[in-house]
Amino acid sequence: MARQSDHRACGFSRRGFFGLASTAAGLFIREAWAGSRKGRLIGSDPALLSPFEREHFPSLSLPPRTRNGAKVPIVVEMSHPMTPDHQVTSLEVVNETDPIPGKGRFHFTPGNGAIYVAFQARMDEGDSEVTVTADCNRHGRWQIRRRISIPEGAGGCAGEAPAWGRVAGDDIHSPEIRIPEQVQRGGIRRGEVIHPQLKIRHPNRTGLAEHDGSFVRASEPLYLEKMEVRFGGEAVSKFEFTPALSDDPFITFALLASREGSLEVRLVNNRGQRFETAHEISFS
């Protein structure tokens, strides 16, 4: 049975109620035009979408069932243009019935070249739905939703944060950047969209504990809060994470290799600790 949240202590929504109330299909897609609160439900078969709709709806990949709620892989990508006058400016990933619903908000620019982000997040046990909302600067918000099932006892939302003085040494390692296109082909071509991968050893804990079937606050959380991507001295992306981020995350994003230059990634956790790394982009 799914645990209930302690509303007085944390203000978290109940998974049990929403699980019983939801009768939607495993996948549904909704369009919400800018300036309008009205939406439109579309069938679960993406092949039925028009080219315009396929361009605007995000693609969400995650396991339909997993036994590791502490590290659920999430991949979001889109075929939407990324030009100054027509672009997706942000994505948001949410599981509304989790004790920490928000999984991350991701801001993009034409410097990304494409919409792509992959990361890992904590989710609670039981049946739930993950929603991705994409914001187009011309056509407003577009949503996709997929179901996920995590067996009882396999949820990943509980976890006390280590004390300030205990986060050092082997607990945290500096971030590293890997460019898979460079590794596979030995070089990068001008104008292609590459997919840098960022690896960092860093604990990310919600600060929640389970007590009598409810989540209660046991400690302050510890987590990577922000990640900024710069290329050639210009801002490309800003990612905002929550305590639902998994330990030692492996984060992938898109970058338009429009020129040679330094790719820089800067991170900060909620305790103000900063981490950064750089990788030189050069053409073969």
Regions found by a protein language model. Give the residues of each.
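N-terminal secretory signal peptides
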Residues: 1-12, 25
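N-terminal export leaders
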Residues: 12-28
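N-terminal edge beta-strand
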Residues: 46-71, 167-190
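Short edge beta-strand/loop segments characteristic of extracellular beta-sandwich folds
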Residues: 73-81, 195-201, 213-216
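Surface-exposed, short loops/turns at beta-strand junctions within beta-sandwich domains
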Residues: 120-127, 255-260
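Short acidic/polar inter-strand loop motif in beta-rich domains
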Residues: 135-144, 269-277
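Low-complexity, Pro/Ser/Thr- and charge-rich linker/hinge segments at domain boundaries
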Residues: 151-174, 284
